[in-house]
Amino acid sequence: MSITIRKLDSTSEGFDAALRAVLAFEASEDEAIERSVAQILADVKSRGDAAVLEYTNRFDRLNADSVAALELPQDALQAALDGLEPKARAALEAAAARVRGYHEKQKIECGTHSWQYTESDGTVLGQKITPLDRVGLYVPGGKAAYPSSVLMNAIPARVAGVGEIVMVVPTPDGVKNDLVLAAALLGGVDRVFTIGGAQAVGALAYGTATVPAVDKICGPGNAYVASAKRRVFGTVGIDMIAGPSEILVLCDGTTDPSWVAMDLFSQAEHDELAQSILLCPDASFIERVEKAIAELLPSMPRQDVIRASLEGRGALIKVRDMTEACRIANDIAPEHLEISALEPQQWSQQIRHAGAIFLGRYTSESLGDYCAGPNHVLPTSRTARFSSPLGVYDFIKRSSLIEVSAEGAHTLGEIAAELAYGEGLQAHAKSAEFRMKG
C-alpha cells in the first residue's frame, strides 16, 4: 500500500525551518465550543444538580431522575471486576500492581515527606507536606474508554494519600465499560458518577448538592472537556491540557525495521494529529523502515488514521550521527522518546527534554502505556522542556514552616525591619521590632 511520509536530511539547507514546520501545532479554539462550555459551566455553577442532570440526560440520551441515581456504588465496580474474562482481569491487576509499586517508590524518592531543621538560636525552619483533600478524575466514555488512564491517574493520587478520589465517566445510552469500572476499583476510586462533558468538569470544580467539589481535576477528554478544564483552572488545579500524542524514535540502525515501523504506528493510530518521527544516521535503514511501513499498514485496523497521521505530521529524518540525533531530540522535547540502539544508556545521558525515555530495542513505548509502572500521563507539544509526567508529587502540596525563637526574633527582626523601612512598609517593620523588645 502506497504511503508518502516526509523525509528530511539534517545536512540539507533549510533543515531547521523544515523541522519547525513538521513540529508546528497550535490547538485551535472553536468559538462555538468555547461559548457552549462557558454557558454550561455558568449554568452548573448557578443551578447545580438540576443543570448537571439536564445536560447529562440530553447529551448522553439518558432518562435519570436525579444526579444521585447517576452514582455507581462500589458493588457495581466489584461486579465489573468479577465479570471480566480471567486474562483481562489478570492483566488489569498486574498493571495496577506495577503502577502502584512504581509510585510507592516515587513517593520515597521524590521529596514527598515533611522536613525541618533547627538553627543555633533555636529557630526552626522546614516544610510540611500535605496530600490534597479531594481529587476529581475525568475518564472519557464511549469508544474512547481507556482503563489504563484510570490506573495512571487514580493510583498516584491514592499513593500520595489523597483523602477522596471522585471519578466521572459518561455512559452514552447507558452503556458502561466494565474495564473502566474495574480499573476504578483497583485504582482506589471512592465515588463514581456516570456524567461527562463540561457539565461534569463544572460539577467537580464548583460542587453540587450531590457531587462534591474537588481540589484538582485530572484526566483526558475531548475539546469540550479541555475547554472546561482551562476555564475552571484557578478555582481548582488541573493536571495539564494535553495535545496530540507524540513519539520520537532515535535508532542507530541495529533494530528490526518492522519493530520501528510498528512503534511509529503505535502513536499514529491515536488520531490524525498524532506525531511519529524517526531520527537515524543510517539512510539504508530508513529505507527499510519505509518499506516495513508500507508492508505492515494494510494489516492495521486503524490504517486510515495511521496513514493520515504519518502523511500529515510524521517524518523520517536522516541525521549525521547519534550525537546530532540527541541534540535534535532535545529541541523536539517529545512526549515519548525511544532510544532503540545497542548502547542506549550512552545516548540517554545526552537527553535533557522528554516526557518518558524508553531505552533499548526491547522497550516498546506501548509497555510504558500500559504496565511498565511509570506514569503514561506525559507532557506534549514541547512542554517536556519544563513539565514532568503525572506523579505522586502532583497530589501533594508544600507549606513552609517557621518557628522563631526569642533570640532569633532579635536577629531576624533587625534584618526584616531594615528591609521593610526600605520598602516603605512601616507596619511590617514595627511588627518585627515589637518582638525585638519582648
Curated annotation (Swiss-Prot):
The active site is at E335, H336. Its EC number is 1.1.1.23. Zn(2+) binds at Q267, H270, D369, H428. Keywords: Amino-acid biosynthesis, Histidine biosynthesis, Metal-binding, NAD, Oxidoreductase, Zinc. Its cofactor is Zn(2+). Binds 1 zinc ion per subunit. SUPFAM superfamilies: ALDH-like. The keyword tRNA-binding does not apply. It is an enzyme of class 1 (oxidoreductase). InterPro entries: Ald_DH/histidinol_DH, Histidinol_DH_CS, Histidinol_DH_monofunct, Hstdl_DH. The keyword Zinc applies. It catalyses: L-histidinol + 2 NAD(+) + H2O = L-histidine + 2 NADH + 3 H(+). Pathway: Amino-acid biosynthesis; L-histidine biosynthesis; L-histidine from 5-phospho-alpha-D-ribose 1-diphosphate: step 9/9. Substrate binds at S245, Q267, H270, H336, D369, E423, H428. NAD(+) binds at Y138, Q199, N222. It holds the Pfam family Histidinol_dh. Catalyzes the sequential NAD-dependent oxidations of L-histidinol to L-histidinaldehyde and then to L-histidine. This is Histidinol dehydrogenase. It comes from Burkholderia multivorans (strain ATCC 17616 / 249).
